[in-house]
Amino acid sequence: MLISTVSALALTGSLFTMSAYADIIIGFIGPITGSVAAYGIQANNGVKVAIDEFNKKGGINGEKLVLKVFDDGAEPKQGVSAANQLVGEGIQYVVGPVTSNIALPVSNILEENDVLMITPSSTTPELSSRGLWNVLRTTGRDDQQGDYAANYFIQHLKDKRIAIVHDRATYGKGLADAFKSALNKGGVTEVFYGNITPGEKDYSVMVSRLKQEKVDYVYFGGYHPEAGLLLKQLREQGVDAPLIGGDGFNTSELWSIAGNAAEGSLFTNAIDVKGNPSAQDAIKALKAQNIPPETFAINGYAAVEVLAYGIEKAGSADDPEAVAKAVKSGEPIKTTLGEITYGDRGDITSKVFGMYKWHNGEIISAE
């Protein structure tokens, strides 16, 4: 089962509002520039196409939608600035932020100003555990990813030596700690636990330590730029250990950086829905605009569907809190991801993750 990987090139029309006269404005906050721009571009493409499709059918409750994009560059200060600008423009609905380090501070600003947000990709448990009324997701949580990866390791690789490394950021450390906790509860102890500094180019000190520990696998909590470099430098030092990671590995840029060093690396990711009947309309619409139906794009598309459901159930878009309550009612919501239900803190309550593997430059199921 193949999964399309991230394309950083399909940004068609995503930096422009769609109409000056739309009734409901949906803001998008995510990295259109910067080291993880691939994630933001992909998610934004999904949002744009979903909005196009809703508008072709008359919008939501007869009101047209408009998309306005705010680039956070994956930098917290820029994300906060984007949120304040969005609030100043009176926007009440947001898809995003894309990364967890932005989602946490931005969610506070949006909550204080009665703005409902639905992130297609922020997985930190802290985002929803604080009990803010305005937080929704179309992805799972780090603890769910960590648990899933650890259980997979225990089931298939229990006798292998594994180290755990993270990038000290909200997303990466959250993944690593969740993996470690579940791994240890399952009776497996890592041979080493440590961290690296994101943005650096030389990880020789960490590579030497991992080589010394004779690791068979390394669980890496972090994004693809550091993962790719770590893999490449491990191979250069004669260490054949694949990485295991989270959905930050789901981009062709990982293979571009690491090359064949990425062969066999595993990662948890949202369950591939491209073969499901529920996803076919979205896939057709994405492809019609030359946009690959990739994970973040699918999640972005689904985020608009969830907002549309809530607005329709609430009767209007005038009260974002009423829209949030409608989404969290427990009723199944038909989306591109299939039927999903929400708990009272905005988390999806159904299974959302699977295990995947890099093989010959492509992503295949590892189940």
Predicted segments with their positions:
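N-terminal signal peptide c-region/cleavage motif recognized by signal peptidases
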Residues: 17-19
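Extracytosolic ligand-binding ectodomains
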Residues: 2-7, 21-367
